[in-house]
Amino acid sequence: MSKLFWAMLSFITRLPVPRRWSQGLDFEHYSRGIITFPLIGLLLGAISGLVFMVLQAWCGAPLAALFSVLVLVLMTGGFHLDGLADTCDGVFSARSRDRMLEIMRDSRLGTHGGLALIFVVLAKILVLSELALRGEPILASLAAACAVSRGTAALLMYRHRYAREEGLGNVFIGKIDGRQTCVTLGLAAIFAAVLLPGMHGVAAMVVTMVAIFILGQLLKRTLGGQTGDTLGAAIELGELVFLLALL
């Protein structure tokens, strides 16, 4: 289990992980690491939340929110934001399914992708600022949001097909079973309930699950399946939806 955690941490983040900690784990077995996604999200959110807490007293909530979101982006290397941008460029191109997938592979940033990045990043900053002004616990909120968003991404992997012939997303999409999905969602729910008691966190997770499930069905109908880019988009949108649900 420890090898899986370190392998997943180095796979979906840019945090430094010694190679020997995950050595010997075959890439084809990475799908088993889905159950570590909520824990990795918890770690990322906690670090981002700590940055917010340290900076809030010095420069106020808006700037603290800006830097906490920036730290979150840096820790993931913009991996999920890139998926969001590519997904929006493809889906909103109003082309054929094959052409959409080609556009999503293009490394150039299009208008729709750029607008999506601006909207999501700005929305996160504004929502975090508002939550802070309302006296909500930002560290707990961010940790729960990142854990839940990565946990609910399993909804786009379970019983979905991969829309392309090959790619990184193929490691997870269609490769996880019902037990892994339930464990992943269960861990995310536990983190949300513990960090944000009074059913506040669980209610926000339910809203997030519904949103991500609907997103998955829409993408399935549009693209014929899921890709690594759509998983990244789901994680980014999941974070935002969860935080919005806390308002």
Swiss-Prot record:
Catalytic activity: alpha-ribazole + adenosylcob(III)inamide-GDP = adenosylcob(III)alamin + GMP + H(+); alpha-ribazole 5'-phosphate + adenosylcob(III)inamide-GDP = adenosylcob(III)alamin 5'-phosphate + GMP + H(+)
Swiss-Prot/TrEMBL keywords: Cell inner membrane, Cell membrane, Cobalamin biosynthesis, Magnesium, Membrane, Transferase, Transmembrane, Transmembrane helix
Segments crossing the lipid bilayer: 34-54, 59-79, 113-133, 138-158, 194-214
Pfam families from the UniProt entry: CobS
InterPro entries on file: CobS
Membrane-protein topology: Multi-pass membrane protein
Assigned EC number: 2.7.8.26
Cofactor (UniProt): Mg(2+)
Subcellular location: Cell inner membrane
An example Gene Ontology CC term for this record: plasma membrane
GO molecular function: adenosylcobinamide-GDP ribazoletransferase activity; cobalamin 5'-phosphate synthase activity
Domain of life: Bacteria
GO biological process, one term: cobalamin biosynthetic process
The protein's annotated pathway: Cofactor biosynthesis; adenosylcobalamin biosynthesis; adenosylcobalamin from cob(II)yrinate a,c-diamide: step 7/7
Family, per entry: Belongs to the CobS family.
Physiological role: Joins adenosylcobinamide-GDP and alpha-ribazole to generate adenosylcobalamin (Ado-cobalamin). Also synthesizes adenosylcobalamin 5'-phosphate from adenosylcobinamide-GDP and alpha-ribazole 5'-phosphate.
Name of the protein this chain belongs to: Adenosylcobinamide-GDP ribazoletransferase
Primary gene name: cobS
